Amino acid sequence: MSSNVLDTLYSIILDRISNKKEGSYTVKLLEKGKPYIARKVGEEATEVIVASLSEGRERFISEVADLIYHLFVLMAVEGVKPEDVYEELKRRMK
């Protein structure tokens, strides 16, 4: 996955935060608050584990995408940019 795709996803999430697009799932998550979003990240992580063990490649990919999306929403709420995570990963590769 290109980091460009991830950056675009994060930009869309930030736009939803700023513009509160009606009917947006991201806006609905934000309205429920940080604790709810954090629980969704945990739920999606569990679904990734289950999919990896018993549901096949396609389902696994779908669940990973869900996890990344929800994690990015939580990151946006926390004020953490993808670049911050990229830098931490680079630091760990030394």
UniProtKB/Swiss-Prot annotation:
Any idea which UniProt keywords this protein has? Amino-acid biosynthesis, ATP-binding, Cytoplasm, Histidine biosynthesis, Hydrolase, Nucleotide-binding
GO CC annotations on file: cytoplasm
- InterPro entries given for it? HisE, PRib-ATP_PPHydrolase-like
Catalytic activity from the UniProt record:
1-(5-phospho-beta-D-ribosyl)-ATP + H2O = 1-(5-phospho-beta-D-ribosyl)-5'-AMP + diphosphate + H(+)
**EC annotation from Swiss-Prot or TrEMBL:** 3.6.1.31
Q: Where in the cell is it found?
A: Cytoplasm
Single Gene Ontology MF annotation:
ATP binding
Task: Give the source's domain of life in one word.
Answer: Archaea
Check the record and name the Pfam families matching this protein: PRA-PH (PF01503)
* Entry-linked CDD domains: NTP-PPase_HisIE_like (cd11534)
Q: What class of enzyme is it?
A: hydrolase
What pathway does the annotation place this protein in? Amino-acid biosynthesis; L-histidine biosynthesis; L-histidine from 5-phospho-alpha-D-ribose 1-diphosphate: step 2/9
| Keyword Nucleotide-binding included in the entry's annotation | yes
Tell me one GO biological process term.
L-histidine biosynthetic process
Family stated for the protein in its record: Belongs to the PRA-PH family.
This protein is called: Phosphoribosyl-ATP pyrophosphatase
According to its UniProt entry, this protein's organism is Sulfurisphaera tokodaii (strain DSM 16993 / JCM 10545 / NBRC 100140 / 7)
